[in-house]
Swiss-Prot record:
Positions where Phosphoserine occurs in the chain: 17, 122, 129, 134-135, 208, 333, 338, 340, 486
Gene coding for it: GATAD2B
GO molecular function: sequence-specific DNA binding; zinc ion binding
Highest taxon above the source species: Eukaryota
Keyword set includes rRNA processing: no
UniProt remark on domains: Both CR1 and CR2 regions are required for speckled nuclear localization.
Organism: Homo sapiens (Human)
Cellular component, GO annotation: chromatin; chromosome, telomeric region; nuclear speck; nucleoplasm; nucleus; NuRD complex; protein-containing complex
GO biological process per UniProt: chromatin remodeling; negative regulation of DNA-templated transcription; negative regulation of transcription by RNA polymerase II; positive regulation of DNA-templated transcription; regulation of cell fate specification; regulation of stem cell differentiation
Protein name (record): Transcriptional repressor p66-beta
Length: 593
């Protein structure tokens, strides 16, 4: 087919532009079909010519007249692996009789590289059949079908109808994309829930295994210590080391109920106290008191490791309770003259405090943790997702600009932009309006909800601890009244008062330990809140309730204490510096994580 000249091509294009659309499409389809057939014929001719060229290389020069017939046949025989000469055509039509008149062929011998190169067909030869549909033709047919469908869709419609149809199709496409993304997100959330369900039992088992170990170690160490006044200097040191280990292990735990379950093992009951003291005798007034006090002192100190994972208000109140309990033991034991009365009072006091502690644990477990606010749906089709809103807004802006280009400038309604009443910002992906009419941005509204939930949980914890302190104060007053009614003797009072001074001295030495061990377990995020809670009015407990006349808690509240303390900033800085754990403990905590 000869090529057209430029004039003929231009004339043909003009004729096609004047023809109707249907005839133009038919002509285009016919032309594509003809071009496809021509391409197939050219490929077949090319393959045939290459076969003939290869046959010319194989045929001997003595037979120039038999090139056409024997060349093609020789090439086909080479492809089949036949090694006999091509000039002998006597046995060509009889299969299986190739080597009757010739010498036998060694099939095991290796063929040389030149022969192997001659036997392999050329990669340029492409064999096509008429039944196969090549990829260019199939792709062109698909394009023709799509083009025909698009032309039929817009046929006989105006510009406005076409724009409306395009907008409708665009909305359908957006809905399909949103549905696809939603299905993907649902699948991801299901996989995450399955992983969480599989991981939680492992963490709980690890917590139940690790946590009770310091309790048993502490009780065994206390039961083996000698019961003499000179051993008082050794026992607090052992208690400190045990307390440090318990705080470090509890800091790695994140489940609060297991810590409280292990705390029940640490708290001694009256039977354990009676078994440690042994049978009461009149001559053992001095020895029973120091043997009883370390056991009772160990109870509040070990309990200070419980609220390490709680909020700071619970930590401060538990620390105050740990200060109260050693003082109450000393003051009750001072006016008791006989060992039987002292044993009964100690048993009743330990039983009452154990019941009070169990009730406090039950109350704290019933208080639910602060629930986070309901999260917004973070997937693409959600209107609460900022990225989705950005894209929709950008699309609307572009569409409005395109629509307004061809129209006259009309008077548009002007709306004042919103401004956040709290942070004064004028841009947010989602505006919120409160009941009182204030308009807030999304970030301010979320922070306000979190603060309200956290404050509510803190108030619940404070009320629970204040109620527990009041009950403990009532128990202490009742025991004081019972002790005042019993007769007293001068020698017993003097001996017990001397023992009371010794115990107060050791209590003052041990008093900072629960606070320091508590500070090691408190996370960094809660330390800033701890200094704020230290100024709360609920902490203004009189010094007489603590049972420690020599201890001043002016670092907790400025109203407590006779002299004027340092400034607020200095006290907060000193308080924060005291809470920084040593390097060795921080390294051990990071190593256990």
């Amino acid at each position: 087919m000869d090529r057209m000249t430029e004039d003929a091509l231009r004339l043909n294009l003009l004729k096609r532009s004047l023809d109707p659309a249907d005839e133009r499409d038919d002509v285009l389809a016919k032309r594509l079909k003809m071009e496809g057939h021509e391409a197939m014929e050219r490929l077949k001719m090319l393959a045939l010519l290459k076969r003939k060229d290869l046959a010319n290389l194989e045929v001997p020069h003595e037979l120039p007249t038999k090139q056409d017939g024997s060349g093609v046949k020789g090439y086909e025989e080479k492809l089949n692996g036949n090694l006999r000469p091509h000039g002998d055509n006597r046995t060509a039509g009889r299969p299986g009789k190739e080597n009757i008149n010739d010498e036998p062929v060694d099939m095991s011998a290796r063929r040389s590289e030149p022969e192997r190169g001659r036997l392999t067909p050329s990669p340029d030869i492409i064999v096509l059949s008429d039944n196969e549909a090549s990829s260019p033709r199939s792709s062109s047919r698909m394009e023709e079908r799509l083009k025909a469908a698009n032309l039929e869709m817009f046929k006989g419609k105006g510009i406005e109808e076409r724009q409306q149809l395009i907008k409708q199709l665009r909305d359908e496409l957006r809905l399909e994309e949103a549905r696809l993304v939603l299905l993907k997100k649902l699948r991801q959330s299901q996989l995450q829930k399955e992983n969480v369900v599989q991981k939680t039992p492992v963490v709980q088992n690890a917590a139940s295994i690790v946590q009770p170990s310091p309790a048993h170690v502490g009780q065994q160490g206390l039961s083996k210590l000698p019961s003499r006044p000179g051993a008082q200097g050794v026992e607090p040191q052992n208690l400190r080391t045990l307390q440090g280990h318990s705080v470090i292990r509890s800091a790695t735990n994140t489940t609060l109920p297991h810590m409280l379950m292990s705390q029940r093992v640490i708290a001694p009951n009256p039977a354990q106290l009676q078994g440690q003291r042994g049978p009461p005798k009149p001559g053992l007034v001095r020895t029973t008191t120091p043997n009883m006090n370390p056991a009772i002192n160990y109870q509040p100190q070990s309990s200070s490791s419980v609220p390490c994972q709680r909020t700071t208000s619970s930590a401060i109140y538990m620390n105050l309770a740990s200060h109260i309990q050693p003082g109450t033991v000393n003051r009750v034991s001072s006016p008791l003259p006989s060992p039987s009365a002292m044993t009964d009072a100690a048993n009743s006091q330990a039983a009452a405090k154990l019941a009070l502690r169990k009730q406090l644990e039950k109350t704290l477990l019933e208080i639910p943790p602060p629930k986070p606010p309901a999260p917004l749906l973070h997937f693409l089709p959600s209107a609460a997702n900022s990225e989705f809103i950005y894209m929709v807004g950008l699309e609307e802006v572009v569409q409005s600009v395109i629509d307004s280009q061809g129209k006259s400038c009309a008077s548009l309604l002007r709306v004042e932009p919103f401004v956040c009443a709290q942070c004064r910002t004028d841009f947010t992906p989602h505006w919120k309006q409160e009941k009182n009419g204030k308009i807030l941005c999304e970030q301010c509204m979320t922070s306000n909800q979190k603060k309200a939930l956290k404050a509510e949980h803190t108030n619940r914890l404070k009320n629970a601890f204040v109620k527990a302190l009041q009950q403990e104060q009532e128990i202490e007053q009742r025991l004081q009244q019972q002790a005042a009614l019993s007769p007293t003797t001068a020698p017993a009072v003097s001996s017990v008062s001397k023992q009371e001074t010794i115990m107060r001295h050791h209590t003052l030495r041990q008093a900072p330990q629960p606070q320091s061990s508590l500070q090691r377990g408190i996370p960094t995020s809660a330390r800033s809140m701890l200094s704020n809670f230290a100024q709360a009015p609920q902490l203004s407990v009189p010094g007489g309730l603590l049972g420690m006349p020599g201890v001043n808690i002016a670092y907790l509240n400025t109203g407590i204490g006779g002299h004027k303390g340092p400034s607020l900033a200095d006290r907060q800085r000193e308080y924060l510096l005291d809470m920084i754990p040593p390097r060795s403990i921080s390294q051990s905590i990071s190593g256990q994580k």
